[in-house]
A protein has these predicted regions:
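Amphipathic alpha-helical "stem/stalk" segments
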Residues: 3, 9, 28, 32-164
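Structural motif
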Residues: 2-5, 16
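N-terminal signal-anchor transmembrane alpha helix of single-pass membrane proteins
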Residues: 10-32
Length: 164
């Protein structure tokens, strides 16, 4: 026969196991909700910029310049306000995405999957200009979050290009 202490012990173990299972389930649900929130936040921002960035891309992509002075002559805020606005809007977008990735609000792989190529293309095209812009205007680091984002996405890009 099973004594009363054994029955009570089994009851306590079952209750404790139930609580533990409930806590684990809750933690897993919270992680899933966090991923969903990240995706939702990213898509809200992406959708806000989608039309503008898509239109701007058609004008910014063919921009050609040799150094800071040449850029300012062709696309500067005084000579070509529309070109300047479009070029700068890309920086605002990549700075925003980089900030969210750095703060852990959005996973870098999510940004990469949706527009990693755009970030790579823009930063490689724009970095020399923005570095010189910072030098000439006394700003030590003009686009820290864009550069951070670029550095986070490049290993993913390289892995994809090498078939990894």
């Amino acid at each position: 026969m099973v004594d009363q202490i054994t029955v009570q012990t089994i009851g306590v173990l079952v209750a404790a196991s139930s609580v533990l299972i409930g806590v684990v389930y809750y933690i897993l649900q919270m992680k899933e909700q966090n991923k969903n929130r990240q995706a939702q936040l990213f898509m809200q921002i992406y959708n806000h910029y989608l039309d503008r960035i898509s239109d701007d891309e058609m004008d910014v992509f063919p921009m050609k310049y040799n150094g800071y002075d040449d850029f300012m002559e062709k696309y500067g805020w005084d000579t070509n306000p529309d070109g300047w606005r479009k070029f700068s809007r890309f920086l605002s977008y990549t700075e925003g995405m980089g900030t969210l990735v750095k703060r852990g609000l959005i996973d870098a792989s999510l940004v990469y999957d949706i527009n990693g190529g755009l970030v790579k293309w823009y930063w490689e095209k724009a970095k020399p200009f923005w570095v010189e812009f910072g030098v000439r205007h006394g700003v030590t680091h003009v686009a820290p979050f864009t550069e951070y984002l670029y550095e986070r996405l490049m290993p993913m890009y390289e892995a994809e290009m090498s078939g990894g």
